C-alpha cells in the first residue's frame, strides 16, 4: 500500500496569494483482497492424466476480475513430471495489465497447522505486485511440492487435498479536497409503513388465513403487489371488499408476507420459527417463495431463492428443485441440478423422501437431471491437454506470443 500527496500551485505572487491558491489531492493505492478454498477429491485418480493437464477450480471474483486455481497432478512441464506437482492462479476474465499479489496455501489436514504457504504478499516491497497481461496469464509454482513427500504427508487426507488461495488486486484512487459534507439519513419508509400496519390505523381490509385474521391497507397492498392490485382495484375486482379469505397458505407465512409488503425486509426468522435450525429455515423459505410468486413480489422471491441457494443440502435439495421448477426460478434450479448431479451427492439425494416427491410432481426434471449428469461426465474438470502450453508471460513453448483462453 502507498499514499502519494500531490500539491499544485495555481498562481504565483505574494505568500498570501500562494496560501490561498494551494490545493491538495491524495492518491491511495491499496489491495482489494479475496479468498477461495479449492478441495481436490480423488487425488489418486487424478494422477496419470499427463503433463500439462490440470484440475481446475470453479471461477471466483476478486477486485472485479474472475480467477481460477489450476492443479497439475503430473506437473506443468515435462521436466517436472517425475518429481513435482504444480499449482497456479490464473486470470479467468478479460483484463489488461492486472496488478495483483498472490498467496497459495496447501492446508495441513491433520489439524497441526503446519500449512505449506507460498506468498507474494510478504515480498511485495522487494519486487512489487505481479502483472497479469491478459486472460489466461498465471502466477504460481511449477515445482510446488515434491510428489513423493506430498503423498506421505498430512496434506493428503482421505485421498483429498485442500488448497487455500488469497488474491489481492491492486487499486488506486485519487481524491480531491472536500469543501463540505452534509450527511443524509437513510430511508425509513419501510419503518414508517410498518408502524402504520402495527398501529392498525386506517386499515380497510381483513384477511382470514388458516383461522387467524390480519388487518391491512388496500392501497399499500395494491401498490406493492400487482396481484393484490388486480384483486382489489382491477376490472374484475370488488373495491368494496372488506374481508378476503386466503386458501392454501399457513398463517405464519402470510404474516411474514405482510411484514415484507410493509417493511420491505424480512422479520427475524429465528424469532419467528423459534429455532435456529437450518432445516426449519429452509422449509419457511420454500413456503415463502411460493407465496411471493403467488403475489408477484419479485424482490421477496429473489431473497428466498438466495436463502435456499445458500442452504442447499442433501435432505432438502429435491423439494427445493421441484419448487424452483414449479415457480420458474431458473438460477435456483441450476444450482440444485448441479448439486444433485455431483457423484458424492446423487445417491444420497435419491434416497430422500424429497426425491420421491420430485419424481411424482416434476417427472420431466428426471430427464434434465440425467442429461446434466451426462454433461458433467463429458466435461470433466480434468481438462484434456490438446492445446499448447501457455506460460505466465503469454508465450507458448516455441516463444511465440499468444492470447490464451480459459475453458
From Swiss-Prot:
Name a biological process GO annotation: cellular response to water deprivation
Which molecular function terms from Gene Ontology are attached? Answer: identical protein binding
One Pfam family cited in the UniProt record for this chain:
BACK_BPM_SPOP
Which GO cellular component terms are attached? nucleus
Inducers of expression: By drought.
Q: Cite the PROSITE patterns for this sequence.
A: BTB, MATH
Domain remarks: The BTB/POZ domain mediates the interaction with some component of ubiquitin ligase complexes.
Quaternary structure, from the entry: Homodimer or heterodimer with BPM3, BPM5 and BPM6. Interacts with CUL3A and CUL3B. Interacts with RAP2-4 and RAP2-13. Binds to MYB56 at the promoter of FLOWERING LOCUS T (FT).
Q: What is this protein called?
A: BTB/POZ and MATH domain-containing protein 1
Gene designation: BPM1
Amino acid at each position: 500500500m502507498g499514499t502519494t500527496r500531490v500539491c499544485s500551485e495555481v498562481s504565483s505572487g505574494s505568500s498570501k496569494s500562494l496560501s490561498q491558491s494551494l490545493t491538495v489531492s491524495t492518491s491511495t493505492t491499496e489491495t482489494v483482497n479475496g479468498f477461495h478454498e479449492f478441495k481436490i477429491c480423488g487425488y489418486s485418480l487424478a494422477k496419470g492424466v499427463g503433463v500439462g493437464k490440470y484440475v481446475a477450480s470453479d471461477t471466483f471474483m476478486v477486485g472485479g476480475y474472475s480467477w481460477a486455481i489450476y492443479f497439475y497432478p503430473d506437473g506443468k512441464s515435462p521436466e517436472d513430471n517425475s518429481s513435482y506437482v504444480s499449482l497456479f492462479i490464473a486470470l479467468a476474465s478479460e483484463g489488461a495489465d492486472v496488478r495483483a499479489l498472490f498467496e497459495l496455501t496447501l492446508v495441513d489436514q491433520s489439524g497441526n497447522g503446519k500449512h505449506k504457504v507460498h506468498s507474494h504478499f510478504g515480498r511485495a516491497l522487494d519486487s512489487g505486485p505481479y502483472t497479469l497481461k491478459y486472460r489466461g496469464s498465471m502466477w504460481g509454482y511449477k515445482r510446488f511440492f515434491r510428489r513423493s513427500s506430498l503423498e506421505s504427508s498430512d496434506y493428503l487426507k482421505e485421498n483429498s487435498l485442500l488448497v487455500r488461495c488469497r488474491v489481492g488486486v491492486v487499486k488506486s484512487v485519487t481524491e480531491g479536497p472536500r469543501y463540505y459534507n452534509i450527511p443524509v439519513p437513510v430511508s425509513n419508509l419501510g419503518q414508517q409503513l410498518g408502524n402504520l400496519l402495527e398501529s392498525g390505523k386506517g386499515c380497510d381490509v381483513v384477511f382470514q388465513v388458516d383461522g387467524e385474521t390480519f388487518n391491512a391497507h388496500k392501497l399499500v397492498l395494491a401498490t406493492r403487489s400487482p396481484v393484490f392490485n388486480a384483486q382489489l382495484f382491477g376490472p374484475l375486482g370488488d373495491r368494496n371488499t372488506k374481508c378476503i379469505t386466503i386458501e392454501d397458505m399457513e398463517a405464519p407465512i402470510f404474516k411474514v408476507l405482510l411484514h415484507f409488503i410493509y417493511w420491505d425486509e424480512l422479520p427475524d426468522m429465528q424469532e419467528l420459527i423459534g429455532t435456529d435450525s437450518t432445516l426449519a429455515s429452509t422449509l419457511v423459505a420454500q413456503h415463502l417463495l411460493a407465496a411471493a410468486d403467488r403475489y408477484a413480489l419479485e424482490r421477496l422471491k429473489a431473497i428466498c431463492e438466495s436463502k435456499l441457494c445458500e442452504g442447499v443440502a442433501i435432505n432438502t435439495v429435491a423439494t427445493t428443485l421441484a419448487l424452483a421448477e414449479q415457480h420458474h426460478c431458473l438460477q435456483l434450479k441450476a444450482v440444485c441440478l448441479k448439486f444433485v448431479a455431483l457423484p458424492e451427492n446423487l445417491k444420497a439425494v435419491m434416497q430422500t423422501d424429497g426425491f420421491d416427491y420430485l419424481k411424482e410432481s416434476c417427472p420431466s426434471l428426471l430427464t434434465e437431471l440425467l442429461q446434466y449428469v451426462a454433461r458433467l461426465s463429458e466435461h470433466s474438470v480434468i481438462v484434456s491437454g490438446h492445446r499448447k502450453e501457455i506460460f505466465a508471460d503469454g508465450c507458448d513453448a516455441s516463444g511465440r506470443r499468444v492470447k490464451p483462453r480459459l475453458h
